[in-house]
Amino acid sequence: MKKIMEQMAEELSAAFEKAGYDPSYGKVTVSNRPDLCEYQCNGAMAGAKAYHKAPFMIADDVVAQLSDSRIFSRAEVVKPGFINLDVKPEFVAEYMNKMAEDEKLSVETAKNPKTIIIDYGGPNVAKPLHVGHLRSAIIGESIKRIGRFVGHKVIGDVHLGDWGLQMGLIITELKHRKPELVYFDDSFTGEYPAEAPFTISELEEIYPCASGKSKEDEAYRNEALEATHLLQQGKPGYMALWNHIMNVSVTDLKRNYANLNVDFDLWKKESDAQPYIPDMVEDMKKRGFAYEDQGALVVDVKEESDTKEIPPCMLLKSDGASLYTTTDLATIVERMKLFQPDEILYVVDKRQELHFIQVFRCARKTGLVNPETKLSFLGFGTMNGKDGKPFKTREGGVMRLENLIADIDEEMYRKIVENRSVKDKDAKDTAKIVGLSAIKYGDLSNQATKDYIFDVDRFTSFEGNTGPYILYTIVRIKSILNRYVQEGGDLSIGKILPAVNASEKNLMLQLSGFAAMVENAFEEKAPHKICAYIYEVSNAFNSFYHETKILSEEDQAQKESFLQLLQLTRRVLETSIDLLGFSAPDRM
């Protein structure tokens, strides 16, 4: 199904051609002055230079070809040469009906589907998720959903940090606290216990304690470094402990991510890439890419066009230990081997930009990826408190993610109970659904690359550009449709008729932009464009709702038309919020 703007552009292009001009000037855009017209074409302005002719004259020639237009009810030339356009209500209604019949609401499936791996989430095991983990998880999840909706094969990978010093610190602290455990007995030859010698809450206390000690006690730090080394060498007792740490930690991470409605296809870890490192490093040395610099092994990645210094990409430290760059490069090797992706996208803090410039350049220079494989980095900004500084607890500490979710849920519960629109037994569940919309929409409505203020009062409001406002609109539509069914109406009967007033036509025009918006949101990896769109659709619907008697309309065909339009609006809004990663309750 052709997008509405494509159909308009085709007609404009044909008019340019008939008038003797290049059809490529027939591009149509949404009007930047909706008080004057619905759409506009600026092609005559662009063509004036090529044809040595006043733009007003070119526009006049083109408009003359639109006198019997199937699409436009008005085509008017405005000096110095703009073409202002209004669309026929019949054409818009016809498009609405086709859109309603289309399973994907007029979004075309990608003609050349790609395999795309999105690396997002990225927590370290044995540490609780905190608010700093929020953005990667929900931005990555949304981009994954949008990519799948437009027809690509998108694989989400959490890429756990499980192989660094934190493991050595936990093992060392456990050894100090419980030296009698069999994991520390070098003479032990039996099977290690199936049950972990700690709970998740104990594990989350052990790590910060060990980390604090290592900063003050050099001998303790050296012991932890040695434990890390022995683990990486495959010491049986330490490997068994590592498995326990992983199992306990991943179970808790899955629970926390489920509360955010974030779901990963792969739970790959840094350790999964370790087997690829020796051959990868050896190959880079053999082919002359890697060389020693002050004892470390590095690859030059600077380019002549650089405007700032890009240091060499370090593969191995002087003691032979690998780094994040090594692991990330080996992970690329693993991903190319297992999935042959067309693109790998990393959704991480923008402060890691230099790291990824080095990794991507090294991967390209050394041939770890195919020349056509796209490596991309979406660096997001910081989530700040009202003071403009990184979001903290009232005491100034880093807030755990589950505490933030609980605080938002509590605030939504209070507002819902005040509203008394939901039975008390359902209020808690409804508060969770609406609370998640407040968090996700509050974040995703901002351009990912920018910092933003996390304002609990604003994000949980039922008014303005918020998640709860969008859900309130969906619930309002559901309520009208349910009432019609309860009165004996059949929602499968009827079709959308030409708009009877300006607010209805505006709603239809907003809905007609769905396909172009989704495709653009994926192309630019920009979930904020979905938020901006559904806010406009919600406003358009609420204006229509306040100006139109829907259920009391006496003309049955007209009433059925309104209800078909409501069903389409609900589908567009529900599909959009699903792409953002949340859903709507039945009542609020």
Regions found by a protein language model. Give the residues of each.
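Non-catalytic interaction-recognition regions
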Residues: 1-93, 110-588
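Short, charged, solvent-exposed linker or helix-capping segments at domain edges/interfaces
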Residues: 94-99
